[in-house]
Amino acid sequence: MKIVVLGAGAWGTALAVNAARAADAGVTRHQVTLWARNAAQVQSLQAERANTRYLPGIALPESLLLQGGGEASLAHAVSGQDLIILATPVAAARGMLQRLQHVTAPLAWLS
């Protein structure tokens, strides 16, 4: 199953890390992507393989894919996914749901 977690704060990062670890351990066969709205944050996540701002001390598994920044990257991130997990702050949820209104994959909204 292909899963994308939208929102690279503490909650989204923790969910993505645990899903990727489960896949790495052979518990699941998921391919997990973590999407951040800010391209600079994605670069930091890739360089450090950690979310030092929101989830310090937790390493990002090498299997965890990282994407982000802009409308094109959001469209690419959700394309072909089997499950989309929306893990953004409540203040951002309305805007994200509007941007995702034409997506047909199942969506889990966590707040």
How would you label these PLM feature ranges?
Residues 62-66, 79-111:
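Rossmann-like NAD(P)(H) cofactor-binding subdomain of soluble oxidoreductases
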Residues 1-58, 65-78, 99:
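NAD(P)+-binding Rossmann beta1-loop-alpha1 motif at the extreme N-terminus of oxidoreductases
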